[in-house]
Amino acid sequence: MPPEQGPVVLGIETSCDETGVGLVRNGTLLGEALSTSMDQHARYGGVVPEIAARAHVQALVPCVRAALSSAGLFVADIGAVAVTAGPGLATALHVGVAAAKAYATALDVPLYGVHHLAGHLAADLVDGEPLPDPLIALIVSGGHTSLLRVGDLARDPITHLGDTLDDAAGECFDKVARVLGLPYPGGPAVDRAAVGHDATALAFPRPLTGRADAPYTFSFSGLKTAVARWVESHPDSPVPAGDVIASFQEAVVDVLTAKAVRACLDHGIGDLLIVGGVAANSRLRALAASRCEQTGIRLRIPARRRCTDNGVMIAALGDLLVRAGAEPSPAELTAMPGAFLERAQLGTALPALHAA
């Protein structure tokens, strides 16, 4: 392989219930594989960490082999390893980090521990153009809801404009779906059940959207409670269940898109990136597209298959770090279940250019 092509980066994702593997070189996707233990968690109504960890142990090596096979490569062709070091379920993260360290050590190649949410920001780099610098990013998933200002993803610190005070948007979807008797996972179930129904049937609250509220901060626990109370107090309501679901969904995506667009306008930034599992929601995608078109903002959302957790996004981020000349993570890299998003890479000191 000519050196100018760069190394093949193996990406490993095991932060929750998906075992994801990707192979990327110089921005090009070479191979991928994905395994999920979602069905094993459905009976419990949520992810069970021990079950997820066991599933990762069983699926990780077969996924690496499948990705290599699809790329026509051998394990010896791997030139660097990137792995989600956090945040996520501790037991699940440990499986991925241990495997990544083993591959890096056995192959004598550099190891890059990366932040799971930064991986989402890099999710469609293999499908599209490089990310604009700067941009406003809205991360919406089961565990996180944040508005960010992002510069050079591989080099610059990430600025939080606002985060959720309580439930993340995806968590709210799951909890309300349970109240409404929808199957797990709740996000896709709500999306499907709302199709063709009246999203204006019920006026559920839009939390933290008043003039005196923090403009980029989110809160969804009150909305969740409002839906639950409405359902409890209207057992014989003539309002179709689909209208209730659509009205709830509209409240969530209205808040998300309004705050994201406002952040772009307030900061004079013309590019909005929406990522995370909830970014697969059809109504969120449609409303974001409409509002961005009205305000002249360029919208970027990954393909639905790239919104949920996967190894390609981790490989793409690792590849970006390699090409930016980032220092590898130390051999002592460990899982960081509660890692806060400040930079794309975890487990390293700040670069010299940011030193005092």
From Swiss-Prot:
Cofactor note: Binds 1 Fe(2+) ion per subunit.
Catalytic activity annotation: L-threonylcarbamoyladenylate + adenosine(37) in tRNA = N(6)-L-threonylcarbamoyladenosine(37) in tRNA + AMP + H(+)
Family matches, as Gene3D superfamilies: 3.30.420.40
Alphabetized Pfam families for the sequence: TsaD
Record flagged with keyword Hydrolase: no
Subcellular location: Cytoplasm
GO CC annotations, alphabetized: cytoplasm
Main location: cytoplasm
Listed cofactors: Fe(2+)
Positions annotated to bind substrate: 139-143, 174, 187, 191, 281
SUPFAM superfamilies, per database record: Actin-like ATPase domain
GO MF term list: iron ion binding; N(6)-L-threonylcarbamoyladenine synthase activity
GO BP term, pick one: tRNA threonylcarbamoyladenosine modification
HAMAP family (alphabetical): TsaD
PANTHER family: TRNA N6-ADENOSINE THREONYLCARBAMOYLTRANSFERASE, TRNA N6-ADENOSINE THREONYLCARBAMOYLTRANSFERASE, MITOCHONDRIAL
Recorded family membership: Belongs to the KAE1 / TsaD family.
Identification of the protein by name: tRNA N6-adenosine threonylcarbamoyltransferase
